[in-house]
Amino acid sequence: SKVLVNWGGQGTYFHPQFCVNGKDTVIEKKRHSTKVIEDECISWLSSRDTSKPFMLMYQFKAPHRDWRPDSIYHDVFADFDFPEPETFNDNYFGRLAASENMMEIENHLNRRAMKLIAPSGLSRRDSMRWLAYGDKGQFWSPNDTLNGEALKKWKYQKYIKDYLATVRSVDDNI
């Protein structure tokens, strides 16, 4: 068995690390995790003992935050704007569990989730803080002209395109 181990046990999208057979052996692959997992599955299927029954179970990091599609999918939805769903302005009233989750487009998408690049000259620690800003309702905008509803719509488009491109890479690798 191989299990993603880095990034809080969820694995990373690029250069994932795997724990092998429950031991401390860690291997790192230098590609997108979705493609790595597909290749590992195909390799295992090709080399298994065909005279014996088998079960192959595999799972992907995708589509967990921060939704990083493989490079071939970066612009797959570039020329398309997705309509906002009916629940776009939902306030989760009367649904306590939903209201306590950090899943609001307006209030819970930080700079990292939006794939922004930290300003040059920051220390690694300050760069990580800069990228994390935007959680818990902290206000930020990628430029001086985006705010209010326009900013919320921009965040939604960025999020939904990254999310669906990430899911597309899973679909194509199953």
What is the predicted function of each stretch?
Residues 1-4:
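Short, well-ordered beta-strand core segments
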